Design a protein with these regions (language model features):
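N-terminal low-complexity, acidic/Ser/Thr/Gly/Pro-rich segments
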Residues: 1-198
């Protein structure tokens, strides 16, 4: 047998890293089918917070917070949610060209007696969405974009505009990324945009 080699090339400044990626197809009880490239990364890092107006004696943005970072990303996904998915007569929502990034940041060393703070951010896009399976009803959408941020229990938010978070969304063989860049000054955000035709 011919010996083979594998190169280990992770940078030490990444700290301990757990990383997985690949092409995946999921069928959840016939209701949800998703197929495409997915990536998961777990590592230690730091984030900058936005300053809270309610705490005039403290500027939360001056010190970075060390966190455990869990990121999940996907690219080029197709998805269907509804009934009879994969059959000749499906009814539900069909999505194409889905890309998404999720970052969950958990404080690594909370203040004594305090619970670790946790912040979540989501960014997603899709090139198209169609509602199919109901005669006479045509719903199509394109250029869909979604952004969500969630604050910690103490009302702080990660300021992604001060320190962007790049999330791997593709496989190592076919790399792609998505950047989280929302400013903490916007507060918690839930927003979506796109072109809709009914």
């Amino acid at each position: 047998a011919t010996p083979s080699t594998m190169t280990l090339d992770l940078a030490a400044n990444l700290g301990e890293v757990t990383r997985a990626s690949g092409n995946l197809t999921i069928d959840a009880f016939g209701f949800l089918q998703v197929s495409g490239a997915l990536a998961l990364n777990k590592s230690t890092g730091s984030v900058k917070l936005g300053d809270l107006a309610s705490t005039t004696e403290v500027n939360e943005s001056t010190n970075a917070v060390t966190v455990e970072q869990l990121t999940i990303g996907g690219s080029g996904l197709t998805a269907f949610a509804g009934i009879n998915g994969g059959s000749s007569a499906p009814t539900g929502l069909s999505l194409e060209g889905v890309n998404f990034a999720v970052a969950i940041q958990t404080e690594k060393t909370p203040a004594q007696g305090q619970t670790a703070r946790e912040w979540t951010a989501v960014k997603a896009s899709a090139t198209g969405a169609n509602f199919i399976g109901v005669d006479g009803l045509v719903v199509t959408s394109s250029a869909i974009n979604v952004e969500i941020t969630r604050k910690a229990a103490d009302n702080t938010l990660v300021d992604y505009s001060a320190q962007n978070q790049v999330v791997q969304t593709g496989t190592l063989a076919s790399p792609s990324t998505m950047t989280l860049d929302l400013a903490a000054g916007l507060g918690e955000v839930t927003r979506a945009s796109g072109n809709l035709t009914i």
